[in-house]
């Protein structure tokens, strides 16, 4: 195989810096001078500015256009991103090479594997995004946003506004503010429900800087805490600390998950921990490597990952504590620094 077509837009951005909404890249394995980037006419000026060293192919149907270009150059075996191709798109692509002698080879996870290890520039952007998240949360707490009577949605929008005010390019995902019994829903969407004294308030959010995402969850109690809330919080905090300590280059992903999961299982709450320990973060909020009990593979040095165990008690409430960290040869670098001590606001 002497050519590879990349069509996943996040992978295109990673390889070229191009941020348009329609694009694909042809990588000439034997000669970089043969590389091409395809996009449509809307992005003629943008592609010239963002990818000045790669010759553009201006066609709306990007992948077929690049395959046709490779055929013209004499390539007979072309790789493509099978996990980025739709069934309909693949039918069009295969029809375009019928009886041509060209063989298409579906590949998965090639660029995602590269993205799993961050370089210094990527880590700097992640640090900046995490710092904005930390500062924004501190600001809304100082301003008294998290108080009885504020709705989940109002608190979420206030936090998002603060991230933008502090320089974020965007929010990493729709902010989760989950109060009371809603905090037992891992991915609750904020409603007009008002926060109340005695509520657990779970906040999961992130900022985007230069395309790179932060991810952090903190859980608080409003005004007065019950013993069961403190007990669940302390359990999740212990599991999270165990998970962070297991972040070492070469560690089996499922063993990292087990380090935290065993703490919760041993306390009798295994059935209330309903997701994996974490995931990679970068140009996407969820990317390789995934850390879960069924995960295969090992943790690479330079990976940016979350550690986010949780215990969720339906009808009562839940606690999740999440940090973003970078795996290093020594202790992992903690990028999200908001205090994790049990806090009553």
Spell out what each predicted region is.
Residues 1-345:
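Active-site neighborhoods and metal-handling regions in enzymes and metal-associated proteins
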